[in-house]
Amino acid sequence: MSETAIQAVERKEKPKEVRSKGFVPGVIYGKGMDSISVKFDEKRLNKALQGRSQKAKISVQVAGETKQCFVGEIQKDITSGKTIHISMQVVEDDQVVKMKVPITFGGSEALSERKLIVLPYFSELELTGPSADIPEYVAVDVADKSLGDKITVADFMVSPSVSVLDDPEKIIAAITGAR
């Protein structure tokens, strides 16, 4: 989980009014709780999400209580790229969740030295397990791969408490020659 919690403030204002004051409107929801309409300071939210995956785990402090959340959906303005709304799902550490997480390929630099590249066919894997054990992303090292090698679901390692729901034989990427 993230080390510091981002502050959320309950809101009654309409989203447009919230945005005009430098905040991002959002909603926090979860199993067995009423949804809470909130607002986040735009700069602090962007800083908290910087370099994180779309489905990042983040601590949110609202009404004096810290909640562990997965980022559900981030809506962006198509012209400015600014975040205009965010939804966050509260989860307990032991709650079993099913979600898609992004894939990363480590060691691509070693491939490029040999004029090879990773050609990804898919960008995420579907996992299930306790929310505390779901990684922000799944990675595979491709540094030692050769031309024509395939990367399958089975090549990705996850915690023993987490299951990958995709077929282990599914080809995720291939190693090809750089153009």
Swiss-Prot record:
Keywords from UniProt, A to Z, are: Ribonucleoprotein, Ribosomal protein, RNA-binding, rRNA-binding
GO: which molecular function terms?
5S rRNA binding; structural constituent of ribosome
What GO terms describe the biological role, i.e. biological process, of this protein?
translation
In terms of domain of life, where is this protein from? Bacteria
Q: Which InterPro entries match?
A: Rbsml_bL25/Gln-tRNA_synth_N (IPR020056), Ribosomal_bL25/Gln-tRNA_synth (IPR011035), Ribosomal_bL25_b-dom (IPR020057), Ribosomal_bL25_C (IPR037121), Ribosomal_bL25_long (IPR001021), Ribosomal_L25_dom (IPR029751), Ribosomal_uL5_bac-type (IPR020930)
Pfam families to which the protein is assigned, alphabetical = Ribosomal_L25p, Ribosomal_TL5_C
Q: Which GO terms describe its cellular component?
A: cytosolic large ribosomal subunit
The UniProt entry, under CDD domains, shows:
Ribosomal_L25_TL5_CTC
Q: Which residues cross the membrane?
A: none
Function, in words: This is one of the proteins that binds to the 5S RNA in the ribosome where it forms part of the central protuberance.
Describe the subunit structure.
Part of the 50S ribosomal subunit; part of the 5S rRNA/L5/L18/L25 subcomplex. Contacts the 5S rRNA. Binds to the 5S rRNA independently of L5 and L18.
Give the similarity note: Belongs to the bacterial ribosomal protein bL25 family. CTC subfamily.
Protein name (Swiss-Prot/TrEMBL): Large ribosomal subunit protein bL25
Species whose genome carries this gene: Desulfitobacterium hafniense (strain Y51)
Source organism phylogeny: Bacteria, Bacillati, Bacillota, Clostridia, Eubacteriales
